């Protein structure tokens, strides 16, 4: 099942840099060149911001400067305002102007005061990083044809806005007090014409500026509300200025009575994009170590561009049904909330795994987000590993950490080569080489998620499950970005590691779903799979897009798992007795305990949709914990644990986890005890998701016990003394489970499992 501002990302992923840095970061060597060397700190800025009585005007020698050629700022002609008379004469001898002309773009000498909004991101050289404060704009940057000061909020008397106090001006400069509390007068001669005209002109400018500021904020309100910490802007500077220019030239905005309605329209358009942008917040924010991928056009913006150019939409998969269903997860009725699959699809919650070393866990989590973090130097393998686990095979976890040896740096395989290596392939193969027509004739779709589709086929006279994931493409899949080779590799290796616990000697369990094979294929979606998809959609109503839009060069990863059975949620009325429920709980606890001992494993999302049950003829199942083998009565059912999207795993000094510290939607859910477990996990690890806290497994065991006691109905009633005693034991387990520290502690110490 399925996440990165970044437009998510997530989905197995990692980065080293901190997120949420305001503005774009300058690279070394990209510093702005000084236009002049200020001889005096008081004269470092243009006279438009300084008091004309304290310092003389500064002349400019640049032909593009608005004060050129060498004339004093005080002699600039006055521009007529809307509230003034059209026939009123100016103080200069320039011809009368019939319309408002655009001002030239600002130059380096124009200060960037605290009253200005933050610079547009991703706009070089007009944007500033956190280490530069002087605003430098390109000559064609101001497409609106008016002063950039119009886009600052109206100055309020009193303290300036503290939000940009540190980045507005350099610390070595001092702004006059008047400039911080009063709007600057564009021309000294205007003030000399009299109080009546000055007041009229200032009121007109303030009114115009206030209207523009409200228009700008109307579009930014929704973005800041649903973005990560309200700090990341999701549009490039050019797109933002183009949108504002369209608003200013809109004839509907010429009438003051229509401005309010226009603002409401802009806000409503932002709400339409909210669900998609939640999963892609901070996508435009580049950080060191981030994957370089082509910028993809969002579905709403892509549709608008196609309408503007007259081209029909090619792949617009965000249907009206899906948009309505994803507006609010928590407004659904109780019956719709019962299925976590539906809720998970609305989240787009397929996050990218973070990969780091054990030593770097805490520092990495503090400085990373749910984006990609890939450790450039892994720690040495844990000494005395045999004391923890005796491995009978070679682990592939080392592939997640790039080699640092100098003489093999240029020979380091790419992530694509690593994935092909795990598939035992040299490159992608056709669908037909992996899935023959004979296999697909009896194909059936059995599940889905944001990641893709799950089908069941018959292979070697046994049912198997195929998890098909599209990778490396530009098309959105179910509203989310496709994974890359780097992002899919950890999922392959984690599934492989947990599957191979069934072949270990020192810590062994068969409780995790078995991975049979992995393939990377290329081509169109097979027609027989589309037929199975259509049947599923007819009978159960799929929440996914029909996978018929892929091109011939599309890549897919096919994970072939053993058939795990039916999830516990759908079996809530089909279990024979409470003794069967006890066996299920025992098997889950044993599997988690073995994974804790071998891999420092936390599942972190073990709801009853991720517990599969299938029939077995075995009377007992064996597991080995720290070299000691024990048995569990099956009562005819075998448990398989699935879905490691949020899981945490550690092997050979490498930690793989999913940082969900910024996923507020996950921690604000209501209507099921499951959502309380997420909040309890965050309380346990203090939102540091790279650390190992096996108590989180205990929390999920408490959740599953609650479901067994309160939500499940058994075919055989608890009438016999033996059944009544088992139920009492389960109730005692439910009351006492939270006092244990781990699944291993529970398995070894609790009376239910003795």
UniProtKB/Swiss-Prot annotation:
Binding site for ATP: 446-454, 467, 562-567, 605-610, 643-645
Sequence positions bearing Phosphothreonine: 379
Basic residues composition bias: residue spans: 294-304, 314-325
GO cellular component term of the entry, any: centrosome
This enzyme's EC code(s): 2.7.11.1
Reactions this protein catalyses: L-seryl-[protein] + ATP = O-phospho-L-seryl-[protein] + ADP + H(+); L-threonyl-[protein] + ATP = O-phospho-L-threonyl-[protein] + ADP + H(+)
Any matching Pfam family: Haspin_kinase
Localization per Swiss-Prot or TrEMBL: Nucleus; Chromosome; Cytoplasm, Cytoskeleton, Spindle
Residue ranges, annotated region (Disordered): 1-113, 245-327
Activity regulation annotation text: Constitutive activity that does not require phosphorylation. Specifically inhibited by 3-(1H-indazol-5-yl)-N-propylimidazo[1,2-b]pyridazin-6-amine (CHR-6494).
Free-text description of this protein's post-translational modifications in UniProt: Autophosphorylated on both serine and threonine residues. Strongly phosphorylated during mitosis but this does not appear to significantly affect its intrinsic kinase activity. Phosphorylation by AURKB is required for full activity toward histone H3 at 'Ser-3' in mitosis.
Extent of Polar residues compositional bias: 45-55
Protein name listed in UniProt: Serine/threonine-protein kinase haspin
EC category name: transferase
Function: Serine/threonine-protein kinase that phosphorylates histone H3 at 'Thr-3' (H3T3ph) during mitosis. May act through H3T3ph to both position and modulate activation of AURKB and other components of the chromosomal passenger complex (CPC) at centromeres to ensure proper chromatid cohesion, metaphase alignment and normal progression through the cell cycle.
Tissue specificity as recorded in UniProt: Expressed in germ cells within the testis of adults and of embryos from day 24 onwards. Also present in adult thymus and weakly expressed in spleen, lung and whole embryo.
Organism: Mus musculus
GO MF assignments: ATP binding; DNA binding; histone H3T3 kinase activity; histone kinase activity; protein serine kinase activity; protein serine/threonine kinase activity
Domain Protein kinase residues, every copy: 440-754
Cofactor(s) for this UniProt protein: Mg(2+)
Catalytic residues in the record: 127 (proton acceptor), 605 (proton acceptor)
Main location: nucleus
Residue(s) carrying Phosphoserine: 55
UniProt cross-references to Gene3D superfamilies, sorted A to Z: Phosphorylase Kinase, domain 1, Transferase(Phosphotransferase) domain 1
Key words, A-Z: ATP-binding, Cell cycle, Chromatin regulator, Chromosome, Cytoplasm, Cytoskeleton, Kinase, Magnesium, Nucleotide-binding, Nucleus, Phosphoprotein, Serine/threonine-protein kinase, Transferase
